[in-house]
Structures are given as C-alpha cells and as structure tokens.
Amino acid sequence: MVAPRGSAQVAERLAPGSYLMFCLVRAPSGETHAIDGMVAEFTVTDQRAAADTPSATADLRLIDAGFRLPSPFPRHGVLRVTNQGKQAHEVTFLTLPSGRGRDAIDPYLRSLRNSSLLQSPPPLKPAGGVAALSPGGTATVTIDLPSGRYLAICLVRGPGGEPHALHGMVQTFTVR
C-alpha cells in the first residue's frame, strides 16, 4: 500500500506466465480502485532481467503469527522480505501519530472482524511494504523512512475470513 502521490520500489521474482495486478482498496465512493480502472495485465518471460534483485541491507520475516523485524529497523536501504509461514502474508508499514501505539489501529481492526473481503484502507498513513507473498516467497522493497514510530501489519485474510492482523500480525517498531 502506497500513500497518495507516493511511490514504492519492490522487486520479486515471478515464474514465467501471465499475471493480473489490481488494487482492492476502496475509494471514498465505496468502489474498489480496480473497478475504477486500477488493473493491469502483464507477462513474465523466461528471459533474465538486465538488473539483478537489489542486495538486501536487512531481513524481515513473515511468520504465521507475526513478524520478525530487523533490529534496529533501518531508515534507508533494501529489505528482503521472506514469507516463512504456511499461508500467504503481506507487510504494510503504517506511520503512527506522535504519542500513539498499537491502540491507533485497534478500532479499525475491530471493524474488520466479520466484514466483507473488500475493505477501506487503514486510517494511518502508509509508508510502504510488500503485497501478499505465497509461502516461501521473497521480495525486496527499498525503504526511506523518516525517524518515528510505525506499525507493521498483515491484512491478508486467513481460512476463517479474518485478517491475519487480528491473530497477531500487527507489531510496532521504531526507526531512529
């Protein structure tokens, strides 16, 4: 998830084939961004890209009940994000308001319980992350985070229909 007018740089190796990329975040109208045209199809060939995956400066692990975040969490660099869980997982970084902790996201998380698959974006400013990775999947994301407090959150829904964040995949961290 990227903040309005923001940008992100993520690298992931994909098997050759046809892919569809779309956004399920809801717009103020209630429609998903995909309905409004935020959809793209692309093809991955077996030709190797000219650029290699960037070298990682730190590792972040996605596990079935949480995150293993680097310590200290770097301000700048490339994070290698690996899903070590048995389910698909993602990580979105959200900026916490000054003086707030996890409580800043709790009302939003409660609203997701038993709600539909489509959801409004979290009420905190996104600061980057990596979209859903299959078990064993790895991606890199370039980060440039100001000093401050953040949340790492996974909003992928599990077999019971609830977002993983409701089962422990939400964690605060500080960037110095």
Describe each PLM feature range.
Residues P28-R68, P72, Q84, S98-L124, ...:
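Extracytoplasmic/periplasmic copper-protein system
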Residues G17-C23, L145-C154:
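A short tyrosine-centered beta-strand micro-motif
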Residues M1-L14, G101-L145, Q171, V175:
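Extracytoplasmic beta-sandwich strand-turn segments characteristic of Greek-key/jelly-roll folds
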Residues P123, G129, L151-I153, G161:
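Extended alpha-helical regions
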Residues L24-R26, F93-G99, I153-R157:
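Predominantly extracellular/luminal cell-surface or secreted proteins
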Residues M1-D64, V78, G129-L133, V141:
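Extracytoplasmic entry segments of secretory-pathway proteins
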Residues T57-G101, L133-G148:
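Surface-exposed interaction/gating patches
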